[in-house]
Amino acid sequence: MNNLQTKFPHIAIKLNEPLSKYTYTKTGGAADVFVMPKTIEEAQEVVAYCHQNKIPLTILGNGSNLIIKDGGIRGVILHLDLLQTIERNNTQIVAMSGAKLIDTAKFALNESLSGLEFACGIPGSIGGALHMNAGAYGGEISDVLEAATVLTQTGELKKLKRSELKAAYRFSTIAEKNYIVLDATFSLALEEKNLIQAKMDELTAAREAKQPLEYPSCGSVFKRPPGHFAGKLIQDSGLQGHIIGGAQVSLKHAGFIVNIGGATATDYMNLIAYVQQTVREKFDVELETEVKIIGEDK
């Protein structure tokens, strides 16, 4: 597997790369092989090679709603951060997988295109956002998603239309079929720039008031359970401020777990499990994680 550097001398590849550099929690072990393609063609080459040689392949986006275990990840990590182009086509925007959702929302603002205001504070990448149908403040990616270019796990290129991109709360066809997002097309609407800016300012202020942006975190840890709010259940369980190792249930928003210093992925996972157990015992409600947990234990 380490011969990938010889096989693909034109592609940026690192060995035993610490993944804590790439996650918002600042935790996680190392990747055996860390690949950073600069083009869709390079990504396609690596995916096809991994499939042909039965090498485990994991896709890494912006690392924002993710916990990578302390033992790291075996096989190949494909990091699509270098695929960042964003372009306008009439009232549509085409953004590549590695483009930040926040940057895409700002691009739309500058082009006087409305529809992505809800995304102005979501820290993920386009690829990650499509994978989990990211959303906030009443908006979701699926509301404006028109089409996507993806790779299958065999390296086959596919163009998916809106009708093929089924989505629900924190779910997508892309996740279900384990597709690798290369780009996304969003259908937006012309609007006065000052009105778009006002909406984004309003949402940014709400986010800054409610979320613990001053600490590393993995964002919203739990999905919203039917008929409840995860943060309220956690707060009512007396868990706000609870600490395990360097991980703490945020004092600002109980739905977040923050790294207050030196946290490990194991600290995060132990605290998540403790919160789930406590809420289950107190309210008979099962909290399902929204954050994705991958990798191996140390």
UniProtKB/Swiss-Prot annotation:
GO terms for molecular function: FAD binding; flavin adenine dinucleotide binding; UDP-N-acetylmuramate dehydrogenase activity. One of its GO terms (biological process) is cell wall organization. Pfam families: FAD_binding_4 (PF01565), MurB_C (PF02873). Pathway: Cell wall biogenesis; peptidoglycan biosynthesis. Disulfide bonds: none annotated. It is an enzyme of class 1 (oxidoreductase). It catalyses: UDP-N-acetyl-alpha-D-muramate + NADP(+) = UDP-N-acetyl-3-O-(1-carboxyvinyl)-alpha-D-glucosamine + NADPH + H(+). It is found in: Cytoplasm. InterPro entries: FAD-bd_PCMH, FAD-bd_PCMH-like_sf, FAD-bd_PCMH_sub1, FAD-bd_PCMH_sub2, MurB, MurB_C, MurB_C_sf, Oxid_FAD_bind_N. One of its GO terms (cellular component) is cytosol. Keywords: Cell cycle, Cell division, Cell shape, Cell wall biogenesis/degradation, Cytoplasm, FAD, Flavoprotein, NADP, Oxidoreductase, Peptidoglycan synthesis. Residues 26-191 form the FAD-binding PCMH-type domain. Belongs to the MurB family. Cell wall formation. HAMAP family: MurB. This is UDP-N-acetylenolpyruvoylglucosamine reductase. It comes from Listeria monocytogenes serovar 1/2a (strain ATCC BAA-679 / EGD-e). The gene is murB.
